[in-house]
Amino acid sequence: MRRSRRAVLRSVLGIGLAAIVFAEIVPRIASYGSVAKQLANVSWPWAVALAVAAALDVLTTALPWRALLPQLSWLGALGFTQASTALTIVLPGGAPLGMAISFGFLRRLRISAGEAGFAVALTGIWSQVMILLYPLVGALLVFGSGNLSTSTATIAGASAAAGAVIAVLAFAVLRSPGSARWVGDMAARVGAWFMRLIRRDPPAWSGEALVQVRAERLAHLRRRWPSLTASTLGNQLTAYLVFELSLRAVGISIEAVPPSESFLAWAIGRVISSLPLTPGGIGVVELGMIGTLVGFGAPHAHVVAAVLLYRALIIVPTLLVGFVALLGFRRLEPQDD
């Protein structure tokens, strides 16, 4: 009962925060009337380009999972990724919630617990490390223009540091059984401490368990990591393509916002979206992206229009495809090992 109340409270707080952003903060940056005018000026060639890019963003979500689990059909991989992402959009929890939901759907697709856990962990690590490193890449691209603010540089540095920590820990796990045991034991202690804070049972995890998983899956990872890396990059950068096209579609020229600045704004938005602040990061992601671009001197109404257009193209197709997929998953039962 307490858990359900806490979940409801988190949802209410997240929705309240998003409402404040859209009702109070965004209108102070640009009126919705002026934003609507910019959106109304999107020509049909730009609309077609945006539709194609949005479709690519949806379709490429299956690539990382197919790289690790080739026994998954394309339709199965696409369906479960969209279903799990749709749930994370409407429920607060960020990346950790998405990983837990993905595991459950893989079990319903008759993937063994070991394979499902391994795939969820690796896709989560690969995705999160890249997301955390993108702001650093963007900051380096912007640095040469002299438009990089101290606050933006700080965000990029902190994000890159977090990504480096995750990458080092992952490398340690792969390097030797002893390192894997140490990382597993440390993760178990941190997990137990966190679960005590929220009054839940500690995770059933240990260093020995990680050593066993490493021994079972290391050869598979050595074969698959190049395709996993390429497919993860391909999927994530299609979302950036949607954002870049959104900027140009509403009339923001490359001179006003060069790709280096748009990439940094997009990268900051991706980092924020992985945090369990609001369902799907709605409100806070938009605010982070708008604030970054406005800080670069871009026209306010155009920026707000582009960001809202981008977010709609990322969220709405996933919700539609995801909830259709959910109807199918309800008929499946998890596999018994």
Predicted regions and their residues:
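Membrane-helix interface segments
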Residues: 43-45, 72-79, 112-113, 150-151, ...
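Membrane-embedded helical hairpins/re-entrant loop segments and their flanking transmembrane helices
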Residues: 58-86, 247-265
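A short amphipathic helical element positioned immediately N-terminal to and/or at the very start
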Residues: 33-38, 106, 209-221
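Transmembrane helix-loop-helix hairpins in multi-pass inner-membrane proteins
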Residues: 1-37, 84-199, 278, 282-337
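Transmembrane helical segments that form the transport core of multi-pass membrane transport proteins
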Residues: 214-271
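Membrane-interface helix starts
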Residues: 8-9, 41-51, 217-230
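Hydrophobic/aromatic residues in alpha-helical transmembrane segments
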Residues: 21, 31, 60-68, 82, ...
